[in-house]
């Protein structure tokens, strides 16, 4: 079929398999250009490995460190009439390129919150790898089905206490608007912590530990975002922030447990990037368009891949083997460049000046839209979008 982008809200409902493959190839090339990572882990599990920071982690481990990787994700394959999800095509491309390099790559597709996902992963590790040296926890799901009851819990992107009103951009109309979001109820806050907090990370680590598949010195990392005062009301000070604080709680508990065998657990605070997850958060697209422009001008812009490469090589797996720098909460801070005072001051001063008319001049909004479409495989250099492509792409993946 000839596949063109179809946007609905903040989701593109079509995806391009060739474009997605090109994206993955580009990220692999970037990783290889950095050279091999010293002291890199050799057997890595990535929970939530099909897009964004999770995919970058898998690529970095495999192509930067030569690791055998297992990826867990929840994606949809294509049918003859409907394209698969971008994460499906990303994972297929990763698997193809890993195998071409002679790297071990296995993937499990299904609900990572389920007990079955944990058990199947453990069985696979025992069968193929014996143990693992690193666990990356990178789930960004809006819902969680509770294994014991089958109840489906939903998270909320809402402030706490007061209605939040701010300048935002309507990405469908390319217009500056005023966005208002009602505050979360106490139940919605608790539900958001249940879905996006640290409990499932702990359950994964406990299951892996109890099964004896964590090697001595195993490191685990989960990803977070704190942001700045421009986004705090909807993010860090909102329901989502409470969930991210729960990740910090989980990291402390896990770090104590893993330290007995020389391992570590950290939350890594990353910079804002264009992902399906961030595009759903009010004010984030406008903030990202603003901060990206300034960071590019300052020569400190990073995408997902650059961020994770820096986390591996300059934080967790340093050449001299030294412990990474952390903040007072034991977090790895990769948002350090974004939070530079000159960059944030620029954004604070620019925010009230942006209008629909000057949006494209004052910010990198055009690039934001291009990067958003790229997530789904569109607008990628070197891809002919008028060519008939087969949406059905198979690879080495087992259903959970």
UniProtKB/Swiss-Prot annotation:
Source organism superkingdom: Bacteria
Annotated active site residues, numbered on this chain, are 235
Q: Main EC class of this protein?
A: oxidoreductase
Q: Which GO terms describe its molecular function?
A: enoyl-[acyl-carrier-protein] reductase (NADH) activity; NAD binding; trans-2-enoyl-CoA reductase (NADH) activity
Recorded hits in HAMAP family, A to Z, give:
FabV_reductase
Role this protein plays = Involved in the final reduction of the elongation cycle of fatty acid synthesis (FAS II). Catalyzes the reduction of a carbon-carbon double bond in an enoyl moiety that is covalently linked to an acyl carrier protein (ACP).
Q: What is this protein called?
A: Enoyl-[acyl-carrier-protein] reductase [NADH]
Q: Which organism is it from?
A: Aliivibrio salmonicida (strain LFI1238) (Vibrio salmonicida (strain LFI1238))
Source taxonomy: Bacteria, Pseudomonadati, Pseudomonadota, Gammaproteobacteria, Vibrionales
């Amino acid at each position: 079929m000839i596949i063109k982008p179809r946007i609905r809200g903040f989701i593109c409902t079509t995806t391009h398999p060739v474009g997605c493959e090109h994206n993955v190839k580009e990220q692999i090339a970037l990783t290889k250009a950095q050279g091999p990572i010293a002291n890199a882990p050799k057997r890595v599990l990535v929970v939530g490995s099909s897009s964004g920071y999770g995919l970058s982690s898998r690529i970095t481990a495999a192509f930067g460190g030569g690791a055998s990787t297992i990826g867990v994700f929840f994606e949809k394959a294509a049918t003859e009439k409907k394209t698969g999800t971008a994460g499906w095509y990303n994972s297929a491309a990763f698997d193809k390129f890993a195998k071409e390099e002679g790297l071990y790559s296995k993937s499990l597709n299904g609900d990572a919150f389920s007990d079955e996902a944990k058990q199947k992963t453990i069985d696979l590790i025992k069968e193929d790898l014996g143990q693992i040296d690193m666990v990356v926890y990178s789930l960004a799901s809006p819902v969680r089905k509770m294994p014991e009851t089958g109840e489906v819990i939903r998270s909320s992107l809402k402030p706490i206490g007061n209605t939040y009103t701010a300048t935002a951009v309507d990405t469908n109309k390319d217009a500056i608007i005023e966005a208002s979001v009602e505050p979360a109820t106490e139940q919605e806050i608790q539900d958001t912590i249940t879905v996006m907090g640290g409990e499932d990370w702990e359950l994964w680590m406990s299951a892996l530990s109890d099964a004896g598949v964590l090697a001595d010195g195993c490191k685990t990392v989960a990803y977070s975002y704190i942001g700045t005062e421009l986004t705090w009301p909807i993010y860090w000070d909102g329901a989502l922030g409470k969930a991210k604080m729960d990740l910090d709680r989980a990291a402390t508990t896990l770090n104590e447990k893993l330290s007995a065998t020389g391992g570590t657990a950290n939350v890594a605070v990353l910079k804002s990037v264009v992902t399906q997850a961030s595009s759903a958060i009010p004010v984030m697209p406008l903030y990202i368009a603003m901060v990206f422009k300034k960071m590019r001008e300052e020569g400190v812009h990073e995408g997902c891949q650059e961020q994770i490469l820096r986390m591996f090589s300059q934080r967790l797996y340093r050449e001299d083997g030294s412990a990474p720098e952390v903040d007072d909460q034991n977090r790895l801070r990769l948002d350090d460049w974004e939070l530079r005072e000159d960059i944030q001051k620029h954004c604070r001063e620019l925010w009230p000046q942006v209008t629909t008319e000057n949006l494209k001049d004052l910010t990198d909004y055009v690039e934001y839209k291009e990067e958003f479409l790229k997530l789904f495989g569109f607008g990628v250099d070197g891809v002919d979008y008028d060519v008939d492509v087969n949406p059905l792409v198979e690879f080495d993946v087992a259903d959970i």
